[in-house]
Amino acid sequence: MELQEVLRMNGGEGDTSYAKNSAYNQLVLAKVKPVLEQCVRELLRANLPNINKCIKVADLGCASGPNTLLTVRDIVQSIDKVGQEKKNELERPTIQIFLNDLFPNDFNSVFKLLPSFYRKLEKENGRKIGSCLIGAMPGSFYSRLFPEESMHFLHSCYCLQWLSQVPSGLVTESGISTNKGSIYSSKASRLPVQKAYLDQFTKDFTTFLRIHSEELFSHGRMLLTCICKGVELDARNAIDLLEMAINDLVVEGHLEEEKLDSFNLPVYIPSAEEVKCIVEEEGSFEILYLETFKVLYDAGFSIDDEHIKAEYVASSVRAVYEPILASHFGEAIIPDIFHRFAKHAAKVLPLGKGFYNNLIISLAKKPEKSDV
């Protein structure tokens, strides 16, 4: 099975769907919103081509479910808020928003929500139906999606940790895994494994910046939010807990060790410094803003029961990783993996050690020399 076929969230609206298990991401989006507003404010000051008539925006790696339109709502509200501040300087423009993700993404679950979303925009923002146009642009964000110099603003949240492929060099010539007992590049991984993952991330992120800089107008903006490394040595991110759960099944004899050793997630969690260095080395963008922050897995969860919280966290992580796990380990063992995941989560949550570190970075495309 091709990797792109399983790099998706759980679709539909069932109990294990991403639509029902993505409340954590809403907390991250709330943290991003003030930065988004400032990014839009700077964008509208830049006097880009045709921006007074139609602002062209894309959400790269939009996923599915209500969070997709929550991002769209935040973008529209930010544009309208800044436009109201400018009053006569800027008439309310049409907004054209492209939702991007891989072809297997459940776009239909988003499209079903559009009629009510448009009505809500009209009621709350005064935006008449037709003044905000939302469509899909399926495909990998590591490849060209739009014509040259056609976009004003690109947004992406919680996507850049996904690599275009599993790094090469994780298996020796004799077929032995160099990442035995692990499913990604963690702090405990061997240096060759860490290097292989960093090299793949550097290649992919450089490609991402180069391709999308070509799609943006000069002075166009890009706002990226991704998971990043923290300084806490004893913290446990969700992939660490997932790795521990799978290892439990190996120890208990429910899963062959070779099955674990042959599995590596196409995921890399960079440091803020690595992201910054790659942006500077690629050279197409100026860094306007960079911030790191952490959000506990159970933040915003009101029920004060560690086991219920742990099940909630397990369901959230399952909605993200089940398709790729099921393609390798089989669907039958998925409930067992996340039952053990919840047990590990219940141990770290009371200690405040279960969280994601996050990075927000705001970028502006540098002008061509001929534009200066």
UniProtKB/Swiss-Prot annotation:
- Pathway(s) this gene product operates in, as recorded in its UniProt entry: Alkaloid biosynthesis
Residues annotated as site: Involved in substrate discrimination:
155, 267, 331
Pfam families in the cross-refs: Methyltransf_7
Q: Which residues bind S-adenosyl-L-homocysteine?
A: 18, 62, 67, 101-102, 140-141, 157, 159
Question: What is the E.C. number?
Answer: 2.1.1.158
Q: Which domain of life is it from?
A: Eukaryota
UniProt-listed GO biological process terms = alkaloid metabolic process; methylation
Give the main EC class: transferase
Task: Provide the free-text tissue specificity comment from this protein's UniProt record.
Answer: Mainly expressed in leaves and fruits (grains). Also present, at lower levels, in roots, stamens and pistils.
Cofactor(s) of this protein: Mg(2+)
Residues given in the record as xanthosine binding sites? 21, 25, 158, 161-162, 316, 321, 356
Quaternary arrangement and interactors, per the entry? Homodimer.
Task: Please state what the protein is called.
Answer: 7-methylxanthosine synthase 1
Underlying gene: XMT1
